[in-house]
């Protein structure tokens, strides 16, 4: 029996990052140098101690030659690397919010974020992967599309099927 809600996609980011880094043959230090960040950032993210910004995840994905959407949220495949549009996050957020007829206050209530956070993102501030996923869930859109401008705007619903019960042969 399935209970509760599935974990957010960004929960798998630490494992995806570590496995992809190791498969590429990079140490934490080597990846940090390729991505232009500190090796502590790689360690914190792989350890699940911090959630990174969309930009940092995009730099890791570029350095590893994989998809930023896959690395951040587990959507698509690792090989689907493409140009990301982080700068368009605010515009995508504002347009979907307006299309859904939601005020900033409605979105604040639905996400638990502050109004300053929502306003900041709509005005171009960078956001963390966990924040974008919370907003995407509240708006009913794909976090990959909202954060990076990649993939379908709305994900197809996940359907879990039960296997038929085994029957005894006569």
Label the predicted regions:
Residues 1-23, 77-99:
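A short, Lys/Arg-rich alpha-helix, primarily the initiator
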Residues 21, 32, 61, 97, ...:
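The alpha-helix within a helix-turn-helix
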Residues 65-80, 140-156:
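Short C-terminal boundary/hinge segments that cap the last helix of small helical domains
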Residues 36-52, 75, 112-127:
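Recognition helix of helix-turn-helix/homeodomain-like DNA-binding domains
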Residues 17, 28, 39, 54-57, ...:
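Helix-turn-helix DNA-binding elements, focusing on the entry/boundary residues of the two helices
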Residues 48-62, 124-137, 153:
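Short, basic-rich loop-to-helix N-cap that marks the start of a DNA-contacting helix
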Residues 17, 28-32, 42-45, 71, ...:
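Conserved hydrophobic/aromatic packing and binding residues within compact polymer-binding modules
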């Amino acid at each position: 029996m399935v209970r509760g809600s599935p974990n957010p996609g960004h929960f798998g980011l630490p494992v995806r990052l570590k496995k992809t880094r190791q498969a590429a043959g990079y140490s934490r230090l080597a990846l940090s140098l390729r991505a232009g960040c500190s090796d502590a950032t790689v360690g914190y993210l792989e350890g699940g101690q911090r959630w990174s910004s969309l930009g940092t995840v995009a730099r890791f994905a570029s350095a590893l030659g994989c998809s930023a959407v896959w690395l951040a949220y587990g959507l698509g495949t690792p090989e689907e690397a493409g140009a990301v549009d982080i700068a368009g996050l605010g515009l995508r957020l504002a347009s979907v919010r307006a299309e859904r007829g939601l005020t900033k206050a409605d979105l604040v209530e639905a996400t638990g974020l502050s109004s300053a956070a929502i306003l900041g993102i709509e005005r171009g501030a960078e956001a963390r992967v966990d924040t974008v996923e919370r907003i995407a869930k509240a708006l009913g859109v794909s976090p990959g599309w909202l954060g990076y401008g990649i993939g379908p705007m709305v994900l197809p619903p996940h359907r879990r099927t039960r296997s038929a019960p085994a029957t005894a042969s006569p």
